[in-house]
């Protein structure tokens, strides 16, 4: 099946799929679950300038979102879990069996494997007796080689057991993680479920289909949307997508002016047809997270939205065009600006920068919409006031 869309229709489809235009598709606690289930996962990043990435993803599209809602779903209700997918991520706990192969790989490979293996039973015994523990509770201060830099043996062992699925995160205090035995928090039926994938290739295709649905549209090529999908570097993505298309799990989308076709999940065809029938959606204004699912694929962003975005957090200050933690601003069906909000002292959300895109005029309607979005973000961050730097006027 092939659908022919204009670029405007492609934008409309993506934005409605993500709940960023029209009446809210995702509301409250259930809305968080619904969006994460639709997306497969949302990416986690611990940096918190004005909310962590996962929180920013949700605040832009879930009506009534609060940070405690997400914490409760993760650490109280256990309907969501934080684990690897597209890097560190949050995904529905019911998907646990589908990651069996990833957990098994962490049992086969890993840095400082001998030291970690020797310490594992001691760590498990400590947690079994004392309950949720962090790396500082274990007294294993020997430094070992680890993924980002040398670290304490306690941290390396806890993280390995977590990667293997023997531990889960019980809760966090800031960036400090407390781990507990998985069997205390996840249903036995999930922990004991067999791997639903018949083989590695079936597993790869499951992940590829999931990532296509997460963004909404993808071409049969490598992109950051497929990070951490096994065999992405060996042409596996294209092969998987063509097989999924042949099986009717993907549909082809030809966008006006773009030679290479895109693909969408077959589950989303009703929305494509709604857009083709002429549906129009009420415009909204939203600040988009730097690792938001919608913008995982920068080529898609350029082709469909005519917008180029670089997260400048790792760019030296002297070389930045914008700011340390700058968020794209979506207004209606266009990315119209970039904004740098920072949660400061005294319950104030400070707007350190606002840069309108070329050709965008600072109309009263636009600037009022940006200000309302800033106030919503301030509220989510527990800030009572929004302040603009002198050079930033709204």
Stretches found by the model and what they are:
Residues 1-286, 292-293, 300, 307-311, ...:
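Long, low-complexity intrinsically disordered regions
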